Amino acid sequence: MESRLKPGLIVLCGPTAAGKSSLAIAIAQRLGSPILSADSRLVYRDFNIGTAKPTPAEQQQVPHYLMDLCDPRQVFTVGDYQDCAVPLIQQLQEKGMLPLLVGGTGLYIKAIVNGLRFPRIAPQPKLRSQLQALGQPLCHALLQRVDPVAGDRIHVNDRVRTLRALEVFYVSGDRLTDLQQEQPPSYPILQIGLDSDRLEARIQQRTQQMLTSGFVEEVQGLCDRYGSDLPLLNTLGYRQVCAFLQGSLSRSELPEQIVLQTRQYAKQQRTWFRADSSIQWIDAEASNRLERALDLIERFRKSEGV
């Protein structure tokens, strides 16, 4: 890409297991673009199989950024993600590149695309400990009471984001929803959505692949290294494997529960992304999905001069 062209950004989003990573690599190879992750769990080191983190071999094909940024014991907020992503995007654009932002964490993507701003409130370990002692169901009920918009947006089982929203409220006295402000970037952005009418089958296939690739062993290693009370171990997939290791789920029930919870999460993602009318959708099952994506990008580049 010539440096005289304007900076821009391509976003590839959609529900989990739709095939974003493989399509992103194919697009990036054709465009010479770097891939920037927009996944809230890929920022953590050692959480690999259960997060479907691109493998080392995949990462060698195309430069990947915004992964393995911090220790799993650290708190990493959307604001922290912005602090990493915004200057990185600018640096890549200044080098004449067209970055490809890829992921399914809607709030991360919205933070970049809409320029959402977040309160810089430091983690409060004592407050978090007190809230955790109440249990996730009560914490989420409290969030629904003090900040209904955030309560609707944050999944009932998402302990990390529930605690963060409550932390912001109790420390600042303001609702997280009210504190968010939008300052959209000046450069043009193309958002491409990837979805499939066979998503359930894809979820089942990927779950089985994770389990045969050593997911249970990964979780056991994480428990041994960080302790079974690590908040990230209470997230999708890891929570179910922990239950299996503790004896409350059988081997046959394990994949069933992972698939069930993943389907619910995918439904939530679809609702989030489908609410954005600016996203242009591609069928993940279409044989020409790469050509379709490249066509959208080419038309975007011509119209915007990027």
From Swiss-Prot:
<dbReference type="GO" id="GO:0006400">
    <property type="term" value="P:tRNA modification"/>
</dbReference>
<keyword id="KW-0819">tRNA processing</keyword>
<dbReference type="InterPro" id="IPR039657">
    <property type="entry name" value="Dimethylallyltransferase"/>
</dbReference>
<keyword id="KW-0460">Magnesium</keyword>
<dbReference type="InterPro" id="IPR018022">
    <property type="entry name" value="IPT"/>
</dbReference>
<feature type="binding site">
    <location>
        <begin position="14"/>
        <end position="21"/>
    </location>
    <ligand>
        <name>ATP</name>
    </ligand>
</feature>
<dbReference type="Pfam" id="PF01715">
    <property type="entry name" value="IPPT"/>
</dbReference>
<keyword id="KW-0067">ATP-binding</keyword>
<keyword id="KW-0808">Transferase</keyword>
<feature type="site" description="Interaction with substrate tRNA">
    <location>
        <position position="105"/>
    </location>
</feature>
<dbReference type="InterPro" id="IPR027417">
    <property type="entry name" value="P-loop_NTPase"/>
</dbReference>
<protein>
    <recommendedName>
        <fullName>tRNA dimethylallyltransferase</fullName>
        <ecNumber>2.5.1.75</ecNumber>
    </recommendedName>
</protein>
<comment type="subunit">
    <text>Monomer.</text>
</comment>
<dbReference type="GO" id="GO:0005524">
    <property type="term" value="F:ATP binding"/>
</dbReference>
<comment type="similarity">
    <text>Belongs to the IPP transferase family.</text>
</comment>
<keyword id="KW-0547">Nucleotide-binding</keyword>
<feature type="region of interest" description="Interaction with substrate tRNA">
    <location>
        <begin position="39"/>
        <end position="42"/>
    </location>
</feature>
<dbReference type="GO" id="GO:0052381">
    <property type="term" value="F:tRNA dimethylallyltransferase activity"/>
</dbReference>
<comment type="function">
    <text>Catalyzes the transfer of a dimethylallyl group onto the adenine at position 37 in tRNAs that read codons beginning with uridine, leading to the formation of N6-(dimethylallyl)adenosine (i(6)A).</text>
</comment>
<feature type="binding site">
    <location>
        <begin position="16"/>
        <end position="21"/>
    </location>
    <ligand>
        <name>substrate</name>
    </ligand>
</feature>
